[in-house]
């Protein structure tokens, strides 16, 4: 039986409400300013005119003029090395295959990634640039064969290979330097950094005083990436204030040992000489042999050389006392005697450029390390065949082969072939 409510509403049609699904909230994804304002063309890269010219010529004329050679871009961080490569690739319609040498460090990874990329053809681009970023990261025990593998790939590559480094003078990179065109990216001046910052705030319509932009530019130490990141920090904090900029502090810039030696040897000011090595990433004990090696390289007069070694000797006394007593407060006196004493040992400044040398003992250590690597490699090869311990192989077979080689090369060659080695391989570990 129908209810009273049904009777009263019998002529009314039911109202069906359309339920809208809830709208998805738009998530704003902020692109970092450094990425947003990365140069799109090579002309947009601030300064570095000579470097840009060499880079363009190398990539465009690689197959005609530069096949078998790499381009090694070096200089302080934030000077535009990586950005320049991407900007040129964008201009030419090339793809960039980037490998970070700090991540892909050994021969297997280098062969697998860079080796394959050096042969294949891009599907959607006119050409390819292989970028090995932070190639100075290829140093250390875990990187066996990494540089050697890269050098072999460069010699056969169908595409231009560009490497970047903050410090290209590492002994491990010697073979790479020999087949590379070295291109320096110089530290940017505050004016060049300011120009980029001004362009960003104008485009972003941000009100910020020129004084603050100049402060950021000076504090960056020529590192454009750091300056843009500092600008972004200030904008996002909402505190656009000179005191906030001061709170960010200055960026200490590492300098290489060669530059520090140049500052110390060329100055006649004690304070400049003593502070020359402040931003060098080496301990005093590691710097000491560099001083010892380069005094006669810089100084030509005997009395200057005598005085310089006299002060270095005084510093060495302090150094030995520190080792014996662990009184590290003496380090200051050792540094003053070493850096200040050597700088003020000369009667007058020597003009012109000096090519400083790494210590001979470092070269000898590097050579010894290379020979030990070869020895390990050959002993491992023999171990599979002879089923003996490494110690016994070196004691009985390798030492005998070395003696036999000096007595009779023909007999030595037959003996080595019988155990699976050659005269050339035994020469490598001599």
Curated annotation (Swiss-Prot):
Q: Which InterPro entries did the record assign?
A: AAA+_ATPase, ATPase_AAA_core, P-loop_NTPase, Rep_factor-C_lsu, RFC_lid
Q: What organism is the protein native to? A: Nanoarchaeum equitans (strain Kin4-M)
Please identify the protein, giving its name as recorded: Replication factor C large subunit
Keyword terms of this UniProt record: ATP-binding, DNA replication, Nucleotide-binding
Q: Which family does it belong to?
A: Belongs to the activator 1 small subunits family. RfcL subfamily.
Per UniProt, what is one GO molecular function of this protein? ATP hydrolysis activity
User: Is the keyword Nucleotide-binding in the record?
Assistant: yes
Q: Which gene encodes it?
A: rfcL
Residue sites binding ATP per the record: 75-82
């Amino acid at each position: 039986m129908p209810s009273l409510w049904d009777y009263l509403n019998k002529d009314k049609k039911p109202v069906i409400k359309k339920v809208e699904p809830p709208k998805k909230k738009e998530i704003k994804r902020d692109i970092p300013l450094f990425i947003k304002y990365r140069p799109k063309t090579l002309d947009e890269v601030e300064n570095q005119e000579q470097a840009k010219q060499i880079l363009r010529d190398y990539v465009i004329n690689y197959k005609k003029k530069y096949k078998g050679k790499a381009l090694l871009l070096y200089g302080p961080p934030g000077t535009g090395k990586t950005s320049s490569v991407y900007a040129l690739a964008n201009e030419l319609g090339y793809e960039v295959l980037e490998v970070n040498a700090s991540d892909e460090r050994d021969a297997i990874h280098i062969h697998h990634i860079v080796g394959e990329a050096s042969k294949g053809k891009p599907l959607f681009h006119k050409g390819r640039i292989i970028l090995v970023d932070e190639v100075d990261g290829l140093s250390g025990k875990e990187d066996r064969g990494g540089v050697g593998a890269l050098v072999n790939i460069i010699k056969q590559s169908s595409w231009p290979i560009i490497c970047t480094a903050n410090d290209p003078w590492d002994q491990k990179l010697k073979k790479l330097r020999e087949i590379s065109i070295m291109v320096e990216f110089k530290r940017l001046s505050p004016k060049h950094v300011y120009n980029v910052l001004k362009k960003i705030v104008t485009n972003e319509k941000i009100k910020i005083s020129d004084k603050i932009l100049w402060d950021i530019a000076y504090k960056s130490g020529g590192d454009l990436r750091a300056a843009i990141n500092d600008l972004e920090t200030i904008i996002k904090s909402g505190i656009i204030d000179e005191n906030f900029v001061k709170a960010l502090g200055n960026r200490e810039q590492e300098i290489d040992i060669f530059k520090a030696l140049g500052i110390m040897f060329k100055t006649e000011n004690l304070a400049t000489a003593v502070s020359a090595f402040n931003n060098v990433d080496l301990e005093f004990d590691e710097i000491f042999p560099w001083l010892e090696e380069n005094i006669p390289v810089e100084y030509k007069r005997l009395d200057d050389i005598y005085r310089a070694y006299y002060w270095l000797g005084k510093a060495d006394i302090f150094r030995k006392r520190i080792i014996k007593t662990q009184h590290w407060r003496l380090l200051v006196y050792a540094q003053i005697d070493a850096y200040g004493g050597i700088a003020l040992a000369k009667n007058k400044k020597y003009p012109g450029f000096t090519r400083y040398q790494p210590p001979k003992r470092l070269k000898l250590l590097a050579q010894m390390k290379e020979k030990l690597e070869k020895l390990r490699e050959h002993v491992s090869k023999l171990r599979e065949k002879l089923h003996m311990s490494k110690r016994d192989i070196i004691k009985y077979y390798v030492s005998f082969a070395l003696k036999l080689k000096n007595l009779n090369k023909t007999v030595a060659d037959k003996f080595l072939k019988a155990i699976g080695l050659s005269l050339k391989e035994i020469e490598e570990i001599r």
